[in-house]
């Protein structure tokens, strides 16, 4: 088995050097190959996560969210049984992030957060897209670190600026089999609601979200 895997890895490197395989697809296939040999264990005895989040616009305030054992188990359970397709896993990601936002809202003022940037005075806990995308990226990184993602990888935050005064940020994932990127956008919704996930090309053009 190990010899066959080494041969397959060598062929993939050869295809990459010849330009017949893009770097994104190479690393995606390499990760899938590694998972097929030793899938990441979701260890029940690992320490509970401590998640740094921010809020109050442009990450003006920070806090550390510490899920209880019961809360974290509910997050992990969103990925059971394992997703049979990338589409199914994206739905799991939506539910898990919604749950993590709810947990954060129990420990911080972010339970007050409303979709977009409403006009609020003296309203601690409201988040702009910088806060939201930063937190979403951290949630995604946690899910990846704990071995919960099999069809996707986490990459840098997505950014768009179609107009000078219309900058926007979101979390971002890449589908490993295809190399397709998706924005994970929580800013449009109230705290604790499943974020929108949209193909990055559509998100860059501000197309309507698929489930809006």
Task: Give the role of each language-model region.
Residues 141-203:
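Hydrophobic/aromatic-rich core segments of domains that either
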Residues 55, 59-60, 67-84, 113-122:
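Acidic/histidine-rich, surface-exposed loop or edge segments in extracytoplasmic proteins
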Residues 39-43:
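Sec/Tat signal peptide C-region and signal peptidase I cleavage site
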Residues 44-61:
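Short N-terminal segments immediately surrounding and downstream of signal-peptide cleavage
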Residues 27-36:
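Bacterial N-terminal signal peptides
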Residues 97-152:
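Mid-length scaffold segments of soluble, non-membrane domains
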Residues 70-104:
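N-terminal, post-signal-peptide region of Sec/Tat-exported proteins
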Residues 1-23:
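N-terminal secretory signal peptides that target proteins for export/translocation
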């Amino acid at each position: 088995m190990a010899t066959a895997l080494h041969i397959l890895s060598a062929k993939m490197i050869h295809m990459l050097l010849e330009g017949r395989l893009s770097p994104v697809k190479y690393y995606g296939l390499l990760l899938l190959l590694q998972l097929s040999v030793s899938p990441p264990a979701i260890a029940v005895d690992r320490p509970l996560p401590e998640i740094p989040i921010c809020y109050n616009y442009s990450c003006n305030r920070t806090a550390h969210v510490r899920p209880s054992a019961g809360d974290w188990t509910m997050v992990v359970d969103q990925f059971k049984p394992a997703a049979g397709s990338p589409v199914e896993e994206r739905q799991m990601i939506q539910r898990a992030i919604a749950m993590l936002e709810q947990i954060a809202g129990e420990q911080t003022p972010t339970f007050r957060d409303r979709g977009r940037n409403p006009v609020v005075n003296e309203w601690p806990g409201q988040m702009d897209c910088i806060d939201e995308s930063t937190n979403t990226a951290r949630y995604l990184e946690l899910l990846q670190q704990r071995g919960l993602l099999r069809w996707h990888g986490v990459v840098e935050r997505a950014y768009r600026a179609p107009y000078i005064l219309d900058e926007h940020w979101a979390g971002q994932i890449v589908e490993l089999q295809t190399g397709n990127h998706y924005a994970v956008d929580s800013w449009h919704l109230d705290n604790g609601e499943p974020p929108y996930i949209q193909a990055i090309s559509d998100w860059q053009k501000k197309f309507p979200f698929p489930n809006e």
